Amino acid sequence: MIYTDPTTGATTSTDAPSTNYLNRLTPNMFLTILAVVVIIALIIIFVQSSSNGNSSGGNVPPNALGGFVNPLNATMRANPFMNTPQRQML
């Protein structure tokens, strides 16, 4: 609590000094810390997504990284109910 002396106008704090950091954490400081954490997380996500997804290394040929593979390809080939003329020509 802040005490103001009525005769001199000087202000003094009557609170005991606190070593707890959470007591000094204002909403402004909290939002600043939160914004910094979000920006760092977005930078990490951006760097990982722009590295072609090959962060594990290994002996993967370079042209296999950029190619598109249809995830439904095996499912569509194994579908017994799909009898199109193009399928019968295979």
From Swiss-Prot:
Write out the function statement from the record: Component of the polyhedra envelope. Plays an essential role in the budded virus production.
Further details from the record: Initially termed ODV-18 since it was found only in occluded viruses. New approaches also found the protein in budded virus. It has therefore been renamed to E18.
Superkingdom: Viruses
Pfam families referenced in this protein's UniProt entry, alphabetically = ODV-E18
| Coiled coil stretches, renumbered | none
Q: Which residues cross the membrane?
A: 27-47
Gene name for this UniProt entry:
E18
Know the name of this protein?
A: Protein E18
The subcellular localization recorded is: Virion membrane
Any idea which UniProt keywords this protein has?
Membrane, Transmembrane, Transmembrane helix, Viral envelope protein, Virion
This entry carries the following GO cellular component terms, namely: membrane; viral envelope; virion membrane
